Amino acid sequence: MGEMCRKGYNRGEFYTSAAVDRPMDIIFIEELRAETWIGIYPREKAMAQTVEISLQIGVSTASAGASDDIRDTVDYAVVVERLRNDLAGSHFNLLEKLTEHIATYLLENFAAQWVRVSVAKLGMMPGVKRVGVIIERSV
């Protein structure tokens, strides 16, 4: 995992490096389906494809936990809507580029300090459920 956040899988705890002076909270979105134009082969460029995206967004949720106000946190409905709209009008040759694009978008637009982004193409090859890329980035 990345420097900014490591998960203790047996205990479900998150740890941070010395670069962050407090524990990091994570908002997650799993198995989001979105349409985008992706691929290098003519058959892939002929139509939009569905990709599956899972996100972990490292932000402090302390204010929202205290206030119970959506304005004090990342609104995941807004994340989903904006990502779907952005990706619907975009083309990427590689999953790596698409994944970087999403990570950068989250870091720049949602005050995230750390993100983990997983993007998969579905049913691309016989006998393979999905192929994909997972990255972690931080500010």
List PLM regions with ranges:
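N-terminal, polar/charged subdomain of small-to-medium soluble alpha/beta proteins
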Residues: 5-139
